[in-house]
């Protein structure tokens, strides 16, 4: 709901002029924001790769949960499966995305765009900061899902934690693509 509201406000505000008291007239104050597209593109790629690693972690957890009952049967050995730390890689990529966002905000500041420069820069910051806050929540969920294994939680509880976190993480990736497109096409 937050992002739908922000999108509606972004599109609505884009078309509205502002009353200027000095001239007693309405002026169009929606300025163009020179976004660091290459850096934002790299961030998008990082987030998409993290969505892939999250999906691999989800599938690994589902497979472990499906095979867990077999391991209790005498004489059945599942062997030593290779355990690749997909959740850990997703966390690292999530941090890389957030660092990239910080660099993008710094680049905007270097180009003279701040939260209060004009309405379009305010919305650009607001949308990306809101996404970063939500992604940080996803990072906390990732760390909780990863710690479930360290805390020896039941396999089904771990699978559910990873599954729910994966759905949220994929939503964050799709939401970022939406924000990226909104900032690019609705300037």
Predicted stretch roles:
Residues 1-187:
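...captures the hydrophobic TM-helix bundle architecture rather than a specific catalytic motif
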């Amino acid at each position: 709901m937050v992002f739908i509201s922000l999108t509606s406000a972004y599109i609505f505000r884009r078309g509205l002029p502002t009353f200027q008291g000095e001239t007693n007239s309405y002026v169009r104050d929606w300025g163009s924001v020179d976004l660091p597209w290459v850096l934002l593109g790299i961030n998008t790629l990082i987030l998409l790769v993290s969505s892939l690693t999250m999906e691999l972690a989800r599938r690994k957890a589902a497979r472990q949960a499906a095979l867990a009952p077999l391991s209790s049967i005498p004489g059945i050995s599942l062997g030593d499966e290779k355990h690749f730390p997909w959740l850990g890689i997703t966390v690292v990529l999530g941090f890389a995305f957030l660092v990239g966002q910080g660099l993008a905000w710094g680049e905007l500041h270097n180009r003279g765009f701040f939260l209060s420069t004009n309405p379009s820069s305010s919305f650009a910051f607001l949308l990306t900061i809101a996404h970063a806050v939500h992604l940080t929540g996803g990072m906390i969920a990732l760390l909780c899902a990863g710690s479930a294994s360290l805390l020896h939680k039941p396999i089904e509880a771990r699978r559910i934690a990873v599954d729910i976190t994966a759905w949220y993480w994929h939503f964050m990736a799709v939401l970022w693509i939406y924000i990226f497109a909104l900032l690019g096409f609705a300037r």
